[in-house]
Design a protein with these regions (language model features):
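Short alpha-helical donor nucleotide-sugar binding micro-motif in glycosyltransferases
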Residues: 256-261
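Conserved donor-binding/catalytic core segment of Leloir-type glycosyltransferases
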Residues: 188-224, 230-234
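Aromatic "clamp/platform" in nucleotide-sugar-dependent glycosyltransferases that forms part
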Residues: 269
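Active-site proximal beta-strand in glycosyltransferases
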Residues: 83-89, 102-124
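Donor nucleotide-sugar binding/catalytic pocket of nucleotide-sugar-dependent glycosyltransferases
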Residues: 144-203
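Membrane-proximal helix-turn-helix segments that form the acceptor-binding/catalytic region
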Residues: 128-149
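N-terminal pre-catalytic "stem/leader" segment of glycosyltransferase-like enzymes
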Residues: 1-96
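Short alpha-helical segment that forms part of, or immediately flanks, the ligand-binding pocket
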Residues: 255, 278-279
Length: 281
């Protein structure tokens, strides 16, 4: 059995940079034969402001992965029972994969890790695209195409199910029953994200001397409520308030600030993962 890992483009300042090597290593340690399908390295490196990827570059990256999947099927490298893991479930390539798998009669098992989408009112798609039919039908199709859909929190599953699969209906007597059935049969999977590396990565910064520093470690996006942080700074002049995304920090520089800070601030309206709080803890 082969495991084909359709990875997410790595942004050095985000956890996706660490996933680039950590996720394949985890799968190999578990005894799997892993082949990573990555996109080109010459895509724009800067993320779209407030996002964790570049909206143009991500399509270049994903399109290359679709081509690679097609060539794997054409060369006979994909066998019945192989697994495909998408570290970003919002990937149109899952449709191409199902097309090839079913028409060529090579059944494979598909896995997708969900981060966000139009169903999340705080995400870019939710704010700028909303419930337009094209995006809602696309996301429902992605969900249906994956055998297993992974979420980091129960909150995320509930939001996804209510806003997307239940179309935001106020009352549906079968909503909870439908969701429970999907959890039982593995269509929904609540699981921790692969971040075992964090303990070792952050250990060197653990006992650093603290100073009067308060960090805002989040993306600058409406649901993060940065205005509260900036207002608080005017009332506590004895502290240094730093918005990390304003600083163009490397990962090492960011971790040094975490080690020195007395507090990590959050007034986030929601968390579907909470990576900054993971790191701050």
């Amino acid at each position: 059995m082969n495991v084909f890992l359709i990875d997410l483009e790595a942004v050095e300042t985000r956890y996706t940079g660490q996933w680039k090597t950590h996720v394949p290593e985890l799968l190999r340690k578990a005894g799997h034969n892993v082949q990573v399908l990555s996109g080109p390295t010459d895509i724009p490196t800067a993320t779209t402001p407030g996002a964790f990827l570049n909206f143009g570059g991500t399509n270049i990256y994903k399109s290359s992965q679709v081509e690679q999947m097609g060539r794997l099927f054409c060369s006979g490298s994909v066998r019945a029972g192989d697994h495909f893991i998408f570290t970003d479930a919002w990937h149109p390539g899952i449709i191409n994969l199902k097309y090839m798998s079913e028409l060529l009669n090579i059944p494979v098992v598909t896995h997708g890790l969900w981060h966000a989408g139009s169903y999340d009112p705080q995400d870019f798609l939710g704010r700028l695209v909303g419930n337009k039919p094209w995006v809602r039908h696309a996301e429902k199709s992605f969900f249906a195409a994956f055998d297993h859909n992974y979420f980091a929190t129960t909150f995320h599953i509930d939001m996804f199910h209510h806003n997307l699969l239940n179309d935001g209906m106020v009352e549906n007597p079968w909503e909870e029953e439908d969701k429970a059935d999907m959890l039982e049969d593995g269509k929904y999977v609540r699981t921790g994200w692969p971040m075992e590396y964090m303990e070792g990565t952050l250990l060197p910064y653990k006992n650093m001397p603290k100073r009067d520093l308060i960090l805002f470690p989040h993306r600058i996006a409406p649901e993060k409520q940065i205005e509260i942080f900036r207002d608080l700074a005017t009332h506590l002049p004895q502290y240094e308030f730093v918005v990390c995304q304003d600083q163009q920090l490397t990962k090492n520089e960011y971790h040094n600030l975490l080690g020195e800070a007395k507090m990590v601030f959050s007034a986030n309206l929601q968390e579907t993962l909470g990576i900054s709080c993971y790191e701050g803890a």
